[in-house]
Curated annotation (Swiss-Prot):
One of its GO terms (molecular function) is phosphoric diester hydrolase activity. PROSITE patterns: GP_PDE. PANTHER family: GLYCEROPHOSPHODIESTER PHOSPHODIESTERASE, CYTOPLASMIC, GLYCEROPHOSPHORYL DIESTER PHOSPHODIESTERASE. Residues 2-240 form the GP-PDE domain. One of its GO terms (biological process) is lipid metabolic process. InterPro entries: GP_PDE_dom, PLC-like_Pdiesterase_TIM-brl. It comes from Bacillus subtilis (strain 168). The gene is yqiK. SUPFAM superfamilies: PLC-like phosphodiesterases. Coiled coil: none annotated. This is Uncharacterized protein YqiK.
Amino acid sequence: MTKIFAHRGASGQFPENTMLAFEKGIEAGADGIELDVQLTKDGRIVVIHDERLNRTTSLKGFVKDTAYDEVKTANAAAGHDQAYSDIKVPLLEDVLSWAVKKDFLINIELKNSVIRYEGMEEKVLEAVKRFNVEDRVILSTFNHDSLALCARLAPHIERAVLTSDVLYQADRYIASIPASGYHPKINSPGVTDEVLKKMRNGLIKVRPYTVNRPEDMKRLIEAGADGMFTDFPEKASALLKNE
């Protein structure tokens, strides 16, 4: 059955990559959450999508140039209603300490394709192991060298190739990393029924992103996609129940 992942939490309605968005995503029926991680100036793993703080918080500047003590003072609901003014940027450990008490999948996207954070892989893996969620985590990144490093450091933790491009002989490429998941962009030529079938036959799990149109959700469910990432998990969950 197709797994629903709340992309940055239930980010279509709530401030993305916040504890509120993750909680609402699971409440909406998602099978898992997707989150993004960057490193602060002092090496803390924070959950935020952009390299800069500007778009989603009340602060400005690069995450990498800002100490965590300053990041934690920010309002992480920039652009949202004042009712969310007390929402903060979570640490990865905040999310994992909440998740460990529940039962859902956790896709951690390492945001290290623009800024190559030294030691990010080791820090993320240490946190995953410390909270004993290795069997529930999927590691993904656009930086496939980083994914290969994760494979060497922790071969037992699931990995997925994240891409916005069409990969030539994608199944062979994914196996060479090695990884067992393929996370392509929903509107790319890499997301066809033929590709889905070929990947599944090769035991590669296909989970496209970001799937917000009901017609795309329905197509993936009918094609037997292993999963999808959506900002609106309640819509995808409702469609899945009707299949």
